[in-house]
Amino acid sequence: MEIKGHYQFSKEYQTILDESIEIDPTFDYAYWAKSIAYLKSGDFVTWKKLIDKAVELNPKEHLGYRGWCRYQFFRDYKGAIKDIEKLDSLVDYDIGQSQNGTYHLNIAKGLCYKAIGEKEKAIAIIEKQIKLNEEEDFVGAYDYLHLGVLYLETEKFEKAFETFKKQSENNELAENQYYLALTYLQLGKPVEAKSCLEKAKELYIEGRKMSDPYSNPMDKIYLEDIENKK
């Protein structure tokens, strides 16, 4: 029986993986593949047992995935940092992207440091990775936005302004115009701020906003956030 063509939640899919593990208990891929259905169905205890086994057997292959899941699904920021930094210590090549492809794992690590209150460290990490991304002409969809918000939160208003402008050029979002409005307010420019809020509302209604099918991204806003600032 082949796994191709079977749905992750199906009995057939899981049975094939179970049989693979019986044949070779060190087959890390099978543990990882089995874990995905449990994560999506909300059985996090079983997911953790399986993904931990996959990491034990092949840390280079699975640490990045587990670290990303810790960030995205569980808000286990310290655990995510630990996994991503461990992966970085094990390999001599680029540690790669998040499972959903939205972020380089170093950007995710920076966001984790922000979440635990280490904003200056977060800025340094994200600045460094964005510079590398720019050299590859592959800046993430939300990279400039997150960095701009960090600048705003640490009162580096001119840097925030410049970075939000880069986000506009790269991938305009309701969030970007919203935080740009907050920056204009800090710079004493209420007219410009009002214009940005109006633009943010238009973009939000058009659906040009941060989104993820499984969780709310960091720095995401809602329509009421815009309305409350107008």
Question: Where would I find each of the regions flagged by the language model?
Answer:
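Terminal, low-structured helical/coil segments at or just beyond the last alpha-helical repeat
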Residues: 192-230
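N-terminal leader/linker segments that initiate helical-solenoid repeat arrays
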Residues: 1-32, 41, 49, 227-230
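Residue at a conserved register position within TPR or TPR-like alpha-solenoid repeats
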Residues: 38, 70-71, 113, 151, ...
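TPR alpha-solenoid repeat register
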Residues: 30, 62-64, 97, 105, ...
